[in-house]
Amino acid sequence: KETYLSRDFRETAAQCFPSQAKELNAFFDARLNVLLAENADASKEKQYHLKRQILPGIAAYETLQRVMPKEEALQTVHGYVEELARTSHKQLAALLRIPGLYRLVPGVFVKSTRSVFGPAAGFDSKELQVGNGIWRVDMMKCPYHDTCVAYGCPELCCCFCDSDDISYAGLHPKLIWHRTKTLGRG
């Protein structure tokens, strides 16, 4: 299934490396298939993150390094992730213009984190404070970080950490998104 990362990668290959695009796409597809096969035994919940973002990100990053320096490849993949995050931010901010809706956000975050970002998906969180419109959590384990480290590209994880910050910071004057650290950025 085509993801935003694979779509954006193919666009970069076609626009920036037209004479090599076919070869780059073939390498990307082959690498992604290997990554998917190596992670086929992961839980359904973890597969959601692996297939949608983590593994296509790794495949794009590795493939781009065939035609550009490592740092440029990292910034290119970061750009893909950032673009999606900015779109997400705009949509969420527009939704939160509905009067009073911001009050539901902490509760929604708690529920979605427990399900989509729970232990079955490879996350381990420690809730520090829940209630009275506040939700504080320490993420102790993250499959984005673990997978990037396992495949020798820990620097790629910051793309996904930054994505959260872009998506959620400044959504509403009465909501504060704040991180002190992430597993990927330290």
What is each stretch, according to the model?
Residues 1-64:
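N-terminal, charged low-complexity regulatory/assembly segments
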Residues 21, 72, 175-176:
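Secondary-structure boundary/capping signal
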Residues 45, 49, 108-110, 120-122, ...:
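Sparse, context-dependent recognition of short Cys/His-centered cofactor- or disulfide-binding micro-motifs
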Residues 52, 56, 62-151:
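Amphipathic interaction/junction segments at domain boundaries or subunit interfaces
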Residues 118-119, 184-186:
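A short catalytic or substrate-binding loop motif that flags glycine-/basic-rich loops and adjacent residues
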Residues 127-184:
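Short, hydrophobic/π-rich interface segment
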